[in-house]
Amino acid sequence: MPRRTDLKSVLVIGSGPIVIGQAAEFDYSGTQACRVLRAEGLRVILVNSNPATIMTDPEMADATYVEPITPAVVEAIIAKERPDAVLATLGGQTALNTAIALYENGVLEKYGTELIGADVEAIKLGEDRQLFKGVVERCGAESARSHLCHSMEEVLAGAADLGYPVVVRPSFTMGGLGSGFAYDEADLRRIAGQGLHHSPVTEVLLEESILGWKEYELELMRDRADNVVVVCSIENFDPMGVHTGDSITVAPAMTLTDREYQRMRDIGIAVIREVGVDTGGCNIQFAVNPEDGRIIVIEMNPRVSRSSALASKATGFPIAKIAARLAVGYTLDEIPNDITSSTPASFEPTLDYVVVKVPRFAFEKFPAADPTLTTTMKSVGEAMALGRNFTEALQKALRSTEKRGATFSWAGEPGDRADLLRRAAQPTDERIGLVMQAIRAGATPEELFESTRIDPWFLDQMFLLDEIAGEVRDSDELTPELLRHAKRHGFSDAQIGELRHLPEDVVRGVRHALGIRPVYKTVDTCAAEFAASTPYHYSSYDEEDETRPREKAAIVILGSGPNRIGQGVEFDYSCVHASFALRDAGYETVMVNCNPETVSTDYDTSDRLYFEPLTLEDVLEVVHAEMRCGPVAGVIVQLGGQTPLGLAAKLEQAGVPIIGTSPQAIDLAEERGAFGQVLERAGLVAPKHGTASSFPGAKAIAAGIGYPVLVRPSYVLGGRGMQIVYDEASLEEYMRTATEVSPERPVLVDRFLDDAIEIDVDALFDGEEMYLGGIMEHIEEAGIHSGDSACVIPPPTLGNAELARVRAATEAIARGVGVRGLLNVQFALAADVLYVLEANPRASRTVPFVSKATGVALAKAAARLMAGTSIRDLRAEGLLPGRGDGGLLPADSPVSVKEAVLPFARFRTAEGVVVDSLLGPEMRSTGEVMGIDVDFPTAFGKSQTAAYGGLPTAGTAFISVADRDKRAMIFPIKRLADLGFTLVATEGTAQVLRRNGITSTVVRKHSEGTSEDGELTIVGRIGAGEIAMVVNTPSGNQARADGYEIRAAATAVGSPIITTIQELSAAVQAIEAAIVQERNGGGVNVASLQEHTARLNAAWEGRA
């Protein structure tokens, strides 16, 4: 069946900001869909609030709306654009829930718009727990015994029938949000209460516990002619009880018997047919009881999911691309396989290698959070590796996570066997390491299985690794056979060096002298049965190399590895742009990365893709392989964040050509003393600072500067380990618990600028001329990490004279450091002094936002500058505007606001309360959104709607502010009262309001408890949903504790919470704008990026 001719335009709904459970994989799937649909000649309209995505680039769709993904906004877009169809299966749970809401409130019918990809009935059958249970039974399969509940009374009755422990699973949520295992009634009340709150239909399913069973997933696709393919089987290394996104997973499944696998396939195919997914993909999860082989169907996602992205990268079978084609009418046998070019998509992929995915966590950012892994997903990213066997893939994947202590180590004593077995029984992110240490301590396979319920086959592979490590350590000499044997099982040069007490580079020298190097195999979807036309490679210590020679010069781009807090999809965005720009300029582009979620690891983003860990050893081998294939013009390290930057100096020492800013210049900007001299020569000032490698040193510096001070380790990204310290006792505590402090790695002590305006600048420099990308003003004051602060382009309160000072200072720094490419500088403006906080000669996390706000692709331009072009040439080519730059935008240009999205609701302490939502100098956001409109209040309002679901326009606001903020709060709070809000406040705050003629009611503090006549405390009232908005600025440590309870309650019920006065002023402006809009009867204003850019260009022309 060829493509439907009745469809002319399609609205694709994206997934919004990156949050835990819904990450970059949806940018990857959405980007693929937009490309395919446009190639089919359809007009593509896209809505997505996340500016850090490739899919929101103006060239990916005909109309790109960077707007909040809410039913009201999407309705406004449908009313304006009148698409024939809506495709919602590629934007995760956000897109699905929005599409269902539009269907149910009649919007789709009103505008004659069809839902394609999966119909509402199929979505409901797959997502509604009770209906899905019926589907499974009709297919002759089993699901776990369960009860569907809509209230706490039903929950308690259900648990009484099933017996503890029970699993709680809310309907229509994502990444296991609100789910968990309840071992007793207290657990059940807490978890089910959360689940009922997070489920949009207030519904949870209670299930019998299948803890300890084996967990599998199948990724399937079906078309309207009823062809079904099983793309991939995936097995979880951890047994049931850990969310699949937090588990180490392996493809293909390793421990199934053929009969079990066939049974699972049969069930999967029956289920996808019964649910009625007939134009796309789905993912089905199974549990298998290891005692008797009983198979239970756990759940299904009738859409593209995190596992689909993994399955796509693992097999080379592009699920999202094919799903988009099926949605517009094609069948599987009509769609060609891109990789082989000679087989159709109805051929099931075959794997002749093993794929392992390892999650990456961020518990160090939330020290109070409980690190136990449960059914609520907590990982923030993942790394994937391919190998010829399980052990090779596993060891490569572990070192790809770039986490200290993630790889197996055989150094030192393993510890007590009984203690290790006890600790390994609890699933945490360190469990696999504990298993290896228990093996070293003499634990038997039976004891380990009893403790962890990890399948004996996987445990046996771990024993094999321990045996090989023993051979390497104990043999008289490192023979070529032994070295090759260890490398075939994934041992790195560093691990072999540790076992032999040799430095890593000596091991590498020996290995190269013996001619032992990896070969590169190809992912071809068909186990080499047909030739592959796309070079998608992985390394292995095998015999035959499959890389091909080439004539053109290549540029190697090092990606950013697994997503983590502080280094997210924004850096991947810059790498992808560089690949596109350099390919257009006539180079062959080579991408090295190990993150399966991203666009950079799509096989058609660059000319060659190496799915490899970003370690010195692996990168050197890739560069060597590419130099064998043809000329290499250089390697780009400044786009992938801190990971590739950290390799720059060592790569250069090894003779690898680094293009762009030199490693020496990178060091110059990072090293305080040298950078201080650059500033001095330019006549610029930094806040007073010093470096210390001991507490007495730090104490002396702090005394000289005066408290508060900002302390942090050198060389970090995302403010890791930073703290604002108010007194000497806290400083001593920090120095005692900080990361390893040594003369090589000193701690930096800075003056902390209270009440300063923070300014962020992204610029390009070619050695002669500077192009200012954009000047952003932060809404929160300095001291909150720039990645967590909201920021605005053009800056709303800076005058032309200040902007001119910022421009001159940025250019002086670019010249002084010797930048070629991108530069990010952070300034603080305090008492009319412009302080330089830091300069980073690399792509920053604001590059995508600035590019979207100003309509200029900065990362593309930067890649060309690194390859030797000048800014003048790029202006002539049209890659940069012919005149002017982002530092002086026209007066009537649209205002863009970037807001950070924080994951506090996911993390709980061991007692089950949420971790504190206070912001500070350590970055904790996982993603971002953008609001864009004609003025600041409306744009800020949109950013809040996109990030947290919006600000209220009526109701009760609770106010409790620190003494230092009491003067500044009066005007915004008075405005709130004038707008009709009811105010409640703590006693001290209420008194100040009363003196200024503002009426408020005093509420009971949390520490006072509920009164005898039943008056709730503020925490109780927030929990009961009586408070529409919380304003709570913290002061000192004691008040922080009372404030913590208030903020935790607000986080738990999803009330907007404001913790700084600057944010309060912005919020009040946004609320007023929304009320005015409502009064005037106006709906939501929506405009596409293409329209904004056209307006901006017209304004530039008008200036000329």
Curated annotation (Swiss-Prot):
One of its GO terms (molecular function) is metal ion binding. Pathway: Amino-acid biosynthesis; L-arginine biosynthesis; carbamoyl phosphate from bicarbonate: step 1/1; Pyrimidine metabolism; UMP biosynthesis via de novo pathway; (S)-dihydroorotate from bicarbonate: step 1/3. Its EC number is 6.3.4.16, 6.3.5.5. Mn(2+) 4 binds at residues 838, 840. The gene is carB. The large subunit is composed of 2 ATP-grasp domains that are involved in binding the 2 ATP molecules needed for carbamoyl phosphate synthesis. The N-terminal ATP-grasp domain (referred to as the carboxyphosphate synthetic component) catalyzes the ATP-dependent phosphorylation of hydrogencarbonate to carboxyphosphate and the subsequent nucleophilic attack by ammonia to form a carbamate intermediate. Large subunit of the glutamine-dependent carbamoyl phosphate synthetase (CPSase). CPSase catalyzes the formation of carbamoyl phosphate from the ammonia moiety of glutamine, carbonate, and phosphate donated by ATP, constituting the first step of 2 biosynthetic pathways, one leading to arginine and/or urea and the other to pyrimidine nucleotides. It comes from the Bacteria. Residues 403-547 are annotated as: Oligomerization domain. Keywords: Amino-acid biosynthesis, Arginine biosynthesis, ATP-binding, Ligase, Magnesium, Manganese, Metal-binding, Nucleotide-binding, Pyrimidine biosynthesis, Repeat. ATP 2 binds at residues 712, 751, 753, 758, 783-786, 826, 838. This is Carbamoyl phosphate synthase large chain. GO terms for biological process: 'de novo' UMP biosynthetic process; glutamine metabolic process; L-arginine biosynthetic process. It catalyses: hydrogencarbonate + L-glutamine + 2 ATP + H2O = carbamoyl phosphate + L-glutamate + 2 ADP + phosphate + 2 H(+). GO terms for cellular component: cytoplasm. Residues 949-1104 are annotated as: Allosteric domain. Composed of two chains; the small (or glutamine) chain promotes the hydrolysis of glutamine to ammonia, which is used by the large (or ammonia) chain to synthesize carbamoyl phosphate. Tetramer of heterodimers (alpha,beta)4.
